[in-house]
From Swiss-Prot:
Lineage, broadest ranks: Eukaryota, Fungi, Dikarya, Ascomycota, Pezizomycotina
Pfam families on file: Peptidase_C14
Gene Ontology biological process terms from the UniProt entry: apoptotic process; proteolysis
GO CC annotations on file: cytoplasm
MF-aspect GO terms: cysteine-type endopeptidase activity
Entry keywords, A to Z: Apoptosis, Hydrolase, Protease, Thiol protease, Zymogen
Main function: Involved in cell death (apoptosis).
Annotated protein name in UniProt: Metacaspase-1
Length: 356
């Protein structure tokens, strides 16, 4: 359906300052540039089995982007700024990070082509396209601006009892898309060293990709108990997958299912950990119990999170993760009450240079 990725990876000295080890040295709005991400696998630690590791991406490989903006024209709860968010983000990614227009899929509800409408079927198809054939050090980008919400959690993996959802333009007939499904498509399949950057400018978006590590400007908010999960056999599936041991993975899954269906209470809610050997980062515009703002900034309707992310990076393109999180918070604080969050598929050294 969608064209493949075109062009060679950026050259060794990329003009894009947020690729690993690129850009003018020492430039960071008067400060030293934070250290780049390590190039070797990093152990999860925190009680995880020895050898259970993840890999940061240096973001020098191929680039693909999926951008979704839904204004819900003619529907109750119509929004004004979501399509503008996508236009602004696509221009920013193209001009500042080397994402080619032909390697972007844009789904907005002002387009005439039915395949470019943000329907549930088109969104799911595009999610599969985004992660297809991804390789280590590729940089994938996912952006959603539209309505978000919550629905009752059916698999027991949410602390508040609710799954986070997004609403396609045809949600009244086709239904919503649940965070579990987005995680399965866009996170679970990624190899070590593949970067997926996601931005959700929607209500109840704090855990929209079901990533287990959550950070705020104050530090870490949430992290999984890997020692407990390892004791339940929940990490062995991922460990086998990382080793390429498909038979081991299947036997582990089979064992978990057998235990879960045999009435063993301790395994009745056994589920695979949501950690990943890949490098998945998510910026969200609100915690799960907050609502995001559809705003007017400089005379243009826009989503507050999308605007703050672009504004903060334009002012200083070489910040650490925690510096960028604070910069986004400071931009939002001038106009809004919502608090930004950073979620990750692995434990994150927030003092490293943010690359994309």
């Amino acid at each position: 359906m969608y064209s493949g990725r075109s062009g060679a990876p950026p050259p060794a000295h990329s003009p894009y300052p947020n690729s690993y080890n690129h850009g003018p040295p020492g430039h960071s709005a008067g400060h030293n540039v934070p250290p780049p991400p390590p190039t070797q696998p990093v152990q999860f630690g925190h009680g995880a089995p020895q050898g259970y590791s993840f890999q940061y991406s240096n973001c020098t490989g191929k680039r693909k982007a999926l951008l979704i903006g839904i204004n819900y024209f003619g529907q109750r709860g119509q929004l004004r700024g979501c399509i503008n968010d996508v236009k602004n983000m696509s221009t920013y990614l193209n001009q500042n990070f080397g994402y080619a227009r032909e390697d972007m899929v844009i789904l907005t509800d002002d387009q005439q082509n039915p395949m470019s409408q943000p329907t549930k079927a088109n969104i799911l198809r595009a999610m599969h396209w985004l992660v297809k054939d991804a390789r280590p050090n590729d940089s994938l980008f996912f952006h959603y601006s539209g309505h978000g919400g919550q629905t009752k959690d059916l698999d027991g993996d949410e602390e508040d009892g609710n799954d986070e959802v997004i609403y396609p333009v045809d949600f009244r007939s086709a239904g919503h898309i649940v965070d579990d499904e987005m995680h399965r498509i866009m996170v679970k399949s990624l190899l070590p060293g593949v970067r997926l950057t996601a931005i959700f400018d929607s209500c109840h978006s704090g855990s929209a990709l079901d990533l287990p590590y959550i950070y705020s400007t104050q530090g870490i908010l949430k992290e999984p108990n890997l020692a407990k999960e390892a004791g339940q056999g929940l990490l062995s599936v991922v460990s086998a997958y990382a080793r390429g041991d498909v038979s081991g993975m299947l036997s582990t899954v089979g064992g978990l299912i057998k235990k879960a269906t045999s009435g063993d209470a301790s395994h009745s809610k056994a589920r695979q950990t949501k950690t990943s050997p890949a490098d998945v980062i998510m910026w969200s515009g609100s915690k799960d119990n907050q609502t995001s703002q559809d705003a007017t900034i400089a005379g243009e309707a826009t989503g507050a999170m999308s605007w703050a992310f672009i504004t903060a990076l334009k002012k200083n393109p070489q910040q650490s993760y925690v510096q960028l999180l604070r910069s986004i918070r400071d931009e939002l604080a001038t106009k809004y009450s919502q608090k930004p969050q950073l979620s990750c598929s692995h434990p994150l050294n927030t003092d490293l240079l943010y690359v994309m």
